[in-house]
From Swiss-Prot:
The modification Pyruvic acid (Ser) is found at S182. The gene is psd. One of its GO terms (biological process) is phosphatidylethanolamine biosynthetic process. The keyword Lyase applies. The keyword Transport does not apply. GO terms for cellular component: plasma membrane. This is Phosphatidylserine decarboxylase proenzyme.
Amino acid sequence: MRPAHCGITPEGWPCIGLTGFSALVFAALGWWPLALVFLVLCWFSMHFFRDPERVTPRGEGLAISPADGKIIRIEEKADPFSGEKRLCISIFMNVFSVHVNRSPVAGTVEDIRYFPGAFVNAAFDKAATDNERCAYSLRDADGKLWSMVQIAGLVARRIVCRTDVGDALERGQRYGMIRFGSRVDLYLPEGYVAAAQLGQQVFAGQCVVARARQS
């Protein structure tokens, strides 16, 4: 499924502008090797900060992926807010993934917590507790609490939060991003099961990763 439109995130324009302008300056001076280097950097910045439109699935009892990437873990872990054991789906984003994060369900943001930390490889187990991260608690229309955690990685050094406590998010709505390779953990509430498989490539705002358990 191809997006109808592919824009650029607001965070990307300074980097794109700087590298693009530098390429033009070096080209005007006849310094072609440097111009080529900055042209490549400009292209990479445009690719990294791309923000394609996505068609979000409709239907009751569905949760869509909060991030582009590969599912590297589906396991029970302690929720960052309640401490209770809940099923967690971990999605690893490499530097070539779209890094805009989207809400898995419609709901209201109840809590946001930032944790300073290290920058080890986001694919490692200890990244969930040791790395810099930002956790969000979201209550859906049925009163169920969802938790999403943005985890900075080995290269990623900035987590971007675009929402506040009390904000109402739609399913698939953008709520933030992480720069240059990272991970998002999605904690499911009771009554939901994983609808994606380990190793599966998923796309934020588009792929269903969990659904309500059939009674």
